[in-house]
């Protein structure tokens, strides 16, 4: 096994249009087959569409959507004496952002609108209003954690 330890975190380059690291992370999550310019077109189009629809700052809308999607708790499997328990644990800030972006893009892809730009825009707008599949996923995750609160003492 290598003994160098974990790879250092590289600084995230902020996007040139909005100057937000969150937008850069979203672009990287939308990215497919290394087509960065296509991913940028999709994300920027979705944010501009969100600005046109609700008239607010698109980055603020995205941040509000992310706050509504980010999970505070999740369950992790823990084996104790032959039984597997779903143990509720707090989610670290970096992981909660990563999960929120993953859910946002995943539920955008599953939507029925014609273009990915429209799907992403509508999912962001829905999430900022507390609706949509990504917000439902967060609520389901929190419900699972609440239901398994009895096993919280197995936390590590």
From Swiss-Prot:
<keyword id="KW-0694">RNA-binding</keyword>
<dbReference type="GO" id="GO:0003735">
    <property type="term" value="F:structural constituent of ribosome"/>
</dbReference>
<dbReference type="InterPro" id="IPR000235">
    <property type="entry name" value="Ribosomal_uS7"/>
</dbReference>
<dbReference type="Pfam" id="PF00177">
    <property type="entry name" value="Ribosomal_S7"/>
</dbReference>
<dbReference type="InterPro" id="IPR005717">
    <property type="entry name" value="Ribosomal_uS7_bac/org-type"/>
</dbReference>
<dbReference type="InterPro" id="IPR023798">
    <property type="entry name" value="Ribosomal_uS7_dom"/>
</dbReference>
<keyword id="KW-0699">rRNA-binding</keyword>
<comment type="subunit">
    <text>Part of the 30S ribosomal subunit. Contacts proteins S9 and S11.</text>
</comment>
<dbReference type="InterPro" id="IPR036823">
    <property type="entry name" value="Ribosomal_uS7_dom_sf"/>
</dbReference>
<dbReference type="GO" id="GO:0000049">
    <property type="term" value="F:tRNA binding"/>
</dbReference>
<dbReference type="GO" id="GO:0019843">
    <property type="term" value="F:rRNA binding"/>
</dbReference>
<keyword id="KW-0687">Ribonucleoprotein</keyword>
<comment type="similarity">
    <text>Belongs to the universal ribosomal protein uS7 family.</text>
</comment>
<comment type="function">
    <text>One of the primary rRNA binding proteins, it binds directly to 16S rRNA where it nucleates assembly of the head domain of the 30S subunit. Is located at the subunit interface close to the decoding center, probably blocks exit of the E-site tRNA.</text>
</comment>
<keyword id="KW-0689">Ribosomal protein</keyword>
<dbReference type="GO" id="GO:0015935">
    <property type="term" value="C:small ribosomal subunit"/>
</dbReference>
<keyword id="KW-0820">tRNA-binding</keyword>
<protein>
    <recommendedName>
        <fullName>Small ribosomal subunit protein uS7</fullName>
    </recommendedName>
</protein>
<dbReference type="GO" id="GO:0006412">
    <property type="term" value="P:translation"/>
</dbReference>
<dbReference type="InterPro" id="IPR020606">
    <property type="entry name" value="Ribosomal_uS7_CS"/>
</dbReference>
């Amino acid at each position: 096994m290598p003994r160098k330890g974990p790879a250092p975190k590289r600084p995230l380059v902020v996007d040139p249009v909005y100057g937000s690291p969150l937008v850069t992370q979203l672009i990287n999550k939308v990215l497919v087959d290394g087509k960065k310019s296509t991913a940028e077109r999709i994300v920027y189009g979705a944010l501009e569409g969100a600005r046109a629809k609700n008239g607010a700052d698109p980055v603020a809308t995205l941040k509000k959507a992310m706050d509504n999607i980010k999970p505070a708790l999740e369950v992790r499997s823990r084996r104790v004496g032959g039984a597997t328990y779903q143990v509720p644990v707090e989610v670290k800030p970096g992981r909660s952002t990563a999960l929120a972006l993953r859910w946002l893009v995943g539920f955008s892809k599953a939507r029925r609108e014609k273009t990915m730009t429209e799907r992403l825009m509508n999912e962001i707008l829905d999430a900022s209003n507390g609706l949509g599949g990504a917000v439902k996923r967060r609520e389901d995750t929190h419900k699972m954690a609440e239901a398994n609160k009895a096993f919280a003492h197995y936390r590590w």
